[in-house]
Amino acid sequence: METSLTTLVVKPGEADRLIAGHPWVYASSIQRSSQPPTDGELVQLKDHRQRFLGVGFFNSRSKIQVRMVSNERVEVNSAFFAERIRAALAVRKRHMPGATSFRVVSAEGDLLSGLIIDKYEDVVVLQISSLGMEQHKADIVKAIQEVLQPRSVYERNEIHSRQYEGLPPVSGLLAGEPVEMVDVTLNRSEEHTSELQ
């Protein structure tokens, strides 16, 4: 990963919360920055002793000014997302063997704040609620195609919370072939039809 990331220093007492795994950094938690960061930019967090705490996406328009993505120095690209999706998928397969429709990625629960990925048989639907994830949408779609190999990838981003990140509502096909309806099997015995258009 490049070492030229903008550095944000958090106030004394805030570091312990981040070290414990809390994924959000509020504006009131930030003491200073090495330079003014750009909205959507990947930044690094340090404590007042210059101890590295992790990296995350910055957005000045949100009360959550940084959404952490890792406590290590990483490069956020399609390979990064593929690795996280594989890890999340492994957990689901372990707890739901044989399931073909389920939530693959559950935002903070899978260390991907602002991203939800649902799998409906061979169709994948993603929902993005943060600017940083929105700017990496192409990387996310590429990772989804690599790991899940779906027939189609859709976005359903009409959620109200996007406005707090300065994002407009949007939905539609991102990759693959158009699909209007999907027959979904839940709990192996229950069938459900999901409308995508």
Where are these regions (language model features)?
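Non-catalytic accessory regions of SAM-dependent methyltransferases
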Residues: 1-121, 178-181
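Structural motif
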Residues: 42-43, 123-125, 151-153
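Surface loops and adjacent helix of pleckstrin homology
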Residues: 57, 129, 158
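Short amphipathic alpha-helical segments
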Residues: 77-84, 132, 136-140
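Non-catalytic substrate-recognition/targeting regions of SAM-dependent transferases
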Residues: 107-118, 136-190, 194
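A short interface-forming secondary-structure element
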Residues: 121-134
